[in-house]
Amino acid sequence: DGAKIVGVKGKIGGARSEEPSLSFSSPLTISAGGYNCPVSRTITEIHNEPHRDDEHFCGGYREYWENVEGLGDPEGPIEIHFIDEVLPGYFWLFPVKEGVVNVGIGMLISEQRKQKGMKKSLKQIQRWVIEEHPRFKTRFANATLVPASQKGWQLPFGSPRKNAPSYQPRRVAMAGAMAVGDAASLVDPFSGEGIGNAL
């Protein structure tokens, strides 16, 4: 409604669905639909501001593994590794529960697009680290991948924008609407962690 968001409209099953459109009105609409939430996009579009800047988005890929060696306490510290083959990103191991670890890799999307060969694919880089890197191949020698645990996604960083127009970081609220979580770009650009910031 011009300078104010008054609700949402959409279809169950997405825009191409045969279902009829539904509309919901509210004095405050919460944008909680992830990094590409339509409400967040509308907030920036209304103000003629960029919604996305690849300098402030990270590509992430993770898998769950069982029986990775050298983890110590199942609720122990996370591991973040800056490996030459992964730069300008990092490789992580985060304990999830006893015997299970979240293993992943992340890289700025703007940098990932500049890579060549294996480094173009986070999944391929991760496979190489697990199978070939001298520091990790022995740790994963007897480990098993948890079936259907592979997932890739994009993380919107809450970092200051350098290019004009400069919004610190991205507009996340306006009359009638407010963004939360990934829709509000709350991911820490150093650690890739966003839950604490979102809370």
Identify the function of each model-found stretch.
Residues 113-199:
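FAD/FMN-dependent oxidoreductases across multiple families
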